[in-house]
Amino acid sequence: MTVTIGLTVSPQHGEMREMRKCWTSAEELGVDALYTADHFTAMIVDRDQATRTAADGVEYGKTQVGGMNFEGSTIEAAMAATTSRPRIGCICHPIGFRNPNLLADMARTVDHVSDGRFILGLGTGFLRADFEEYGYEYATQADRARELARDVPIIKDRLKKLNPPPMGKLPLLIASMGEKIGMRVVAEHADMWHVFGPIETIRAKIQVLRRLCDEVGRDFNEIELTTNYWPQILGRDDDPNIYLAEGIRHLVLVAEGPKWDLGQVREILAWRDSLPD
C-alpha cells in the first residue's frame, strides 16, 4: 500500500526566509508533496470558533483578514526551484483569479522549473476578501462552479498547444465538493480530488463521486483521493488510518507561519513509514 504525505506551507504571517527553510526541511524529512495556498489576503482564524459543515467541510467561525501574505503562483515557482524531489502545487488556485490560458501557461512553466513535478490544483475559492481586494467579482458558489466547468477544458486544451508542452502528464487536482456541478467536473477531468471535512462527509462524498464517474463513463479508481489531515482545526480523530479505510492515500498537513513548525509532519511521516508494503 502506497501512502503519500503532502504539506501545505501557508504563505502567510511570516518571512520568506523562514518559509524557504520549511520547504527544504520538509523535503529532507521525506514529504512527498509541497503545496502553497492562493490568497490575496492573509487569514487569521479563531480556531476555538471553527465549526464543521456537512456540505463544505470546514466553516471558519471567525475569520479576520490581515497580516503578511505572499502570492501563491510565484511561491510555486520558488518551491520548484528550491527543491528537487517532492511534487509541487497549490491547494488550490481559485479559477476566477487568472485567465485559464494564462494559468495553463504558468503551470507548464513551473512544471519545467520543477523538472516535471508540478500538480495544477484548481478550485472555486471561498474567501470574499480575496476577490474584493483585487477587484474580482465574488459570484455565487454555483456561478463559480460553472466557471470551473467552463475553464477546465480550456486549460487542458491550452496545455496541449503550448511549445514546449509540459514535461509529462501534468496532474490536475480539483478541490470541489458541489454535487451538481463541481464534482461532475472532477469525475470528467480530475487526476486528483481533494475532499475535506469530517469523515462522515468524506465518506458520503466519495459515494457521490463513484456515482458521477459511472454516469460519465469514468473509472473511479483513476482518480487519486486526497484530503487535509488537520485535526487541530477540524476536530478530527487523530488516527490517520480512518482515511485509508475510505481509499484515501494522500494526506495533506498544514504548516503555518511565522515558524512553520514540522512536529506533526515528523509524526505522520513516522506513521507512513511504519505501514506494511
Predicted regions and their residues:
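Alpha-helix-loop-beta-strand connector modules within alpha/beta enzyme cores
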Residues: 49-90, 146-158, 214-222, 227, ...
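C-terminal amphipathic alpha-helical "assembly" element
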Residues: 1-32, 111, 115, 119-121, ...
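Glycine- and other small-residue-rich loops at beta-strand/loop junctions that grip anionic moieties
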Residues: 11, 65-68, 92-95, 174-175, ...
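N-terminal beta1-alpha1-beta2 module of alpha/beta enzyme domains
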Residues: 1-82, 198, 275
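Internal, glycine-rich beta/alpha segment that forms the wall or movable "lid"
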Residues: 44-46, 58-60, 90, 96-189, ...
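Beta->alpha turn/N-cap motifs
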Residues: 37-39, 126, 196, 254
